[in-house]
Swiss-Prot record:
Residues 82-98 have a biased composition (Basic residues). Residues 121-136 have a biased composition (Basic and acidic residues). Residues 71-136 are annotated as: Disordered. Glycans are attached at N239, N249, N289, N345, N499. Residues 142-301 form the F5/8 type C domain. The gene is Cpxm2. The lineage of its organism: Eukaryota, Metazoa, Chordata, Craniata, Vertebrata. This is Inactive carboxypeptidase-like protein X2.
Length: 764
């Protein structure tokens, strides 16, 4: 009794200490319920790097697991006391394989489907409650989308690695299809590369929520000079980044076959989907003459987590009822027909020609009077798919078609005004041959270039005639008479010959742009997030990058900014660069030549050969995003696509007529201080894109007296009306009179010579 009496105070003290400890653990657990995710992340990282050895947390495991852990700790302590050698049995937890097997053994299909559903839910709940052991699911295989390494949905903070050679080869560069810069020894290299070549290296993705992992896609290092790739690897998963379970193949660890070269992606599906938060890739072999380097994408389905405030806050949804899927050629044509049937009064389907393999290049016109050019109404176009593997632009334009039709039918005032005041042309797929090749590869396995070129191997983006060189050579010859105008520069004869290396698709676009008096256009591309404006070609010889502005540089800057500033991500200073270039210093815009020089681009050709101001719009880091990404990409670009079309109504517009009120075609419109002219269309109407300000504008035409007036451009949307009435010159009137009476006018020089000859004969 005395012993019991003395033991009671000690027992009470121990119970009090346990209560305090449990309260501390509860307080610590409560931190996970805070809405500020980043506080949780900092706490987790401190624990991750501060405790390299796993420490069991009492509240995160079930009571049955406490006994297993105690048994395991005893087995681990005894060898250390006997010689510090751990037997192989102590490496694997005892209960983890049993639990894994238990969950994997789902019952066969039975009559009571509700019972099976309840058991599946209970198993997933057990997986979510057990933060230490991942769960394998052997249910019907679900096709899971990529987590988003390539699309940057997975942030740099979610990527970790055992070691890295340097910052430019860190874990944050281990993204599928990421591209290296010209100088590969900078911060923007083409893969994650381990600091050492041994079997202890790994790269890890933190999904930040329970995820059903189903597969891994890998690539080698993107480099012009080096050959580095991983030829085999293991896959491990975890719920706490300390206790890891290796994907098994029977009783042993499964070795996945990796890459045999550095660019073609290789997909490996897990034999059984694994539910966990973390996934780790552990290279086992690599190219003999290279290093451990890889790029990757993870396939997985995030499990619903209503208690996670961070993910609910960042989920992207759309209210537009559109067809969010990838459309092959047949499906694209069918969607166009559906839109045309929905809105027959404002749409028209036509084709501008055929591809190398005979596929028609379909376009859709949207106008209140489809099929005709209305005097005073500007023409606008969108083009996508010049590179067949840059699929996002194609799908965005198909979504735009459907959206404009729906909103016009719903009497959306903004869309109705746009359709009634603009003639819109949309060409979703300029290179359908290349697209079909990329479509066969799929959104993740096509690599960076499959389907980029036409069927005959031509890059349409730089297949147009180089008119820049003709213009600049003429400008450099100041003493010689001007042979090349500053606009409507003629296409060289060699380019028009049948033997010229010109794609069928390129010739079709040129004929299309010569036929329709486009004022503004945008060609949608992929692989970056920026708007590029001309010139695209540098003026200085032997330079690959140099800012080369057009005479309308201020207008082009505004047009580019109008798209970028209304895009959800382009001007976001917090966003990560896609590959190597940081375009935030110019608010998501760039002069094409200062980025990289391109001779014969569509932008430069359009500016120098037609009236059209053309820009390249790079709509996403991922050229070919998964279908699940399309709603978010539509939300990112929808407002920008509409705002850019509305810019066709900025500047001045008018009609150039003669005294009888007839429109004068091919009249030249010049703006003082801008060394670039435009011309009137067949009805005498014109549109000149200008920023707000006061301008001195001149209209001139052959056989007419030049007319000049001041035109004011305001800040409000809508072009300022600036009409001209030209009077014929005396010589033109004489010629007109003589032609009316069937006689040719007598030229004055020849008449004077005849009079002189008569006088000489009379004197002689």
């Amino acid at each position: 009794m005395a012993r019991l009496g003395t033991a009671c105070p000690a027992l009470a003290l121990a119970l009090a200490l346990v209560a305090v400890a449990l309260a501390g653990v509860r307080a610590q657990g409560a931190a996970f319920e805070e809405p500020d995710y980043y506080s949780q992340e900092l706490w987790r990282r401190g624990r991750y790097y501060g405790h390299p050895e796993p420490e069991p947390e009492q509240e995160l495991f079930s009571p049955s697991m406490h006994e297993d852990l105690r048994v395991e700790e005893q087995e681990q302590q005894e060898p250390h006391q006997q010689g510090h050698r751990t037997p192989k049995k102590a490496i694997k937890p005892k209960k983890a394989p049993k639990r894994e097997k238990l969950v994997a053994e789902t019952p066969p299909p039975g009559k009571n489907s509700n019972r099976k559903g309840r058991r599946s839910k209970n198993l997933e709940k057990a997986a979510s409650d057990d933060h230490g052991v991942p769960v394998a699911h052997e249910d019907v295989r679900e096709s899971c989308p990529p987590l988003g390494l390539e699309t940057l949905k997975i942030t740099d903070f979610q990527l970790h690695a055992s070691t890295s050679k340097r910052y430019g080869l860190g874990a944050h560069r281990g993204r599928l299809n990421i591209q290296a810069g010209i100088n590969e020894n900078d911060f923007y290299d083409g893969a994650w590369c381990a600091g050492r070549n041994d079997l202890h290296q790994w790269i890890e993705v933190d999904a930040r929520r329970l995820t059903k992992f189903t597969g891994v896609i890998t690539q080698g290092r993107n480099s012009l000079w080096l050959s580095d790739w991983v030829t085999s690897y293991k896959v491990m998963v975890s719920n706490d980044s300390h206790t890891w379970v290796t994907v098994k193949n029977g009783s042993g660890d499964m070795i996945f076959e990796g890459n045999s070269e550095k660019e073609i992606p290789v997909l490996n599906e897990l034999p059984v989907p694994m539910v966990a938060r973390y996934i780790r890739i552990n290279p086992q072999s690599w190219f003999d003459n290279g290093s451990i380097c890889m790029r990757m994408e993870i396939l997985g389905c995030p499990l619903p987590d209503p208690n996670n405030y961070y993910h609910r806050r960042n989920e992207m949804t759309t209210t537009d009822d559109l067809d969010f899927k990838h459309h092959n050629y047949k499906e694209m044509r069918q969607l166009m027909k559906v839109v045309n049937e929905m809105c027959p009064n404002i749409t028209r389907i036509y084709n501008i020609g055929k591809s190398h393999q005979g596929l028609k290049l379909y376009a859709v016109e949207i106008s209140d009077h489809p099929g005709e050019h209305e005097v005073g109404e500007p023409e606008f176009h969108y083009i996508a798919g010049a590179h067949g593997n840059e699929v996002l632009g194609r799908e965005l334009l198909l979504l735009l078609l459907h959206f404009l039709c729906q909103e016009y039918s719903a009497q959306n005032a903004r869309i109705v005004r746009l359709v009634e005041e603009t003639r819109i042309h949309i060409l979703p797929s300029l290179n359908p041959d290349g697209y079909e090749k990329a479509y066969e590869g799929g959104s993740e396995l096509g690599g960076w270039s499959l389907g980029r070129w036409t069927h005959d191997g031509i890059d349409i983006n730089n297949n147009f005639p180089d008119l820049n060189s003709l213009l600049w050579e003429a400008e450099d010859q100041q003493n010689a008479p001007r042979k090349v105008p500053n606009h409507y520069i003629a296409i060289p004869e060699w380019f028009l010959s049948e033997n010229a290396t010109v794609a069928t698709e390129t010739r079709a676009v040129i004929a299309w742009m010569e036929k329709i008096p486009f004022v503004l256009g945008g060609n949608l591309q992929g692989g970056e997030l920026v708007v590029a404006y001309p010139y695209d070609m540098v003026r200085s010889l032997w330079k690959t990058q140099e800012h080369t502005p057009t005479p309308d540089d201020h207008v082009f800057r505004w047009l580019a900014y109008s798209y970028a500033s209304t895009h959800r991500l382009m001007t976001d200073a917090r966003r990560r660069v896609c590959h190597t270039e940081d375009f935030q210093k110019e608010e998501g815009t760039v002069n094409g030549a200062s980025w990289h020089t391109v001779a014969g681009s569509l932008n430069d050709f359009s500016y120098l050969h037609t009236n059209c101001f053309e820009l390249s719009i790079y709509v996403g880091c991922d050229k070919y995003p998964h279908e699940s990404e399309l709603p978010e990409e539509w939300e990112n670009n929808r407002e920008s696509l509409i705002v850019f079309m509305e810019q066709v109504h900025r500047g001045i517009k008018g009609i150039v007529r003669d005294l009888q009120g007839k429109g004068i075609s091919n009249a030249v419109i010049s703006v003082e201080g801008v060394n670039h002219d435009i011309r009137t269309a067949s009805d005498g109407d014109y549109w000149r894109l200008l920023n707000p300000g006061e301008y001195v504008v001149t209209a001139k035409a052959e056989g007419f007296i030049t007319s000049t007036k001041n035109c004011m451009v305001g800040y409000d949307m809508g072009a300022t009306r600036c009409d001209f009435t030209l009077t014929k010159t005396n010589l033109a009137r004489i010629r007109e009179i003589m032609e009316t009476f069937g006689k040719q006018p007598v030229s004055l020089p020849s008449r004077r010579l005849k009079l002189r000859g008569r006088k000489r004969r009379q004197r002689g």
